[in-house]
């Protein structure tokens, strides 16, 4: 039985583990990032924005939870505002709350999302970008390039966890007990290799990235990526890993 290391945050690992196990794969959960809500922010008047951008399920989860607790009337304004999402899961999480989203890009990353938008729709307008503490600045940069204004709202923090099982994972790598390392964000990859080091890798271990943003971050670290799914979501990621490990 092939074994996959899962580096997702603890609260998000279970669904992905189930998907991998459905393909007969064994898993080792080693969260390399911890997600926490940011305190002390207020939900802005959403009618002031020409559109709102969400680039992860976490941004949707923490934004909507706080909105429903502190400013539930703003949900109607959100439902009446143009909303863009990166990734199928991000879009689905918004739609569960009655929020209509603009068409998803074929390749689920910020660059391709912005490439699908006519710059004329951006120029002179103000947009809201709901983000995490380590989210990339691609969307604000491109909005500014197109002549628009972007207000950034950080609703969650990406923090490195304590990584108590570091030695165990090092030992498993050294003993050839891990067949694939899976990464779902640049942060999961960065924290993993800071803790473990790339010297521990053997050629037999396959590296899987959920999308182009994560694969790009890995490649910048000098790590060759073997597996990228056709669609950048959990089920497609699990399927791609299973097919590669046959």
From Swiss-Prot:
Q: Where is the signal peptide?
A: none
Keyword list (alphabetical) reads: Lyase, Porphyrin biosynthesis
Describe which pathway this protein belongs to, using the record's wording: Porphyrin-containing compound metabolism; protoporphyrin-IX biosynthesis; coproporphyrinogen-III from 5-aminolevulinate: step 3/4
Q: What reaction does this enzyme carry out catalytically? A: hydroxymethylbilane = uroporphyrinogen III + H2O
Q: Which InterPro entries match?
A: 4pyrrol_syn_uPrphyn_synt_sf, 4pyrrol_synth_uPrphyn_synth, UROS/Hem4
Pfam families on file: HEM4 (PF02602)
**The name this protein goes by in its record:** Uroporphyrinogen-III synthase
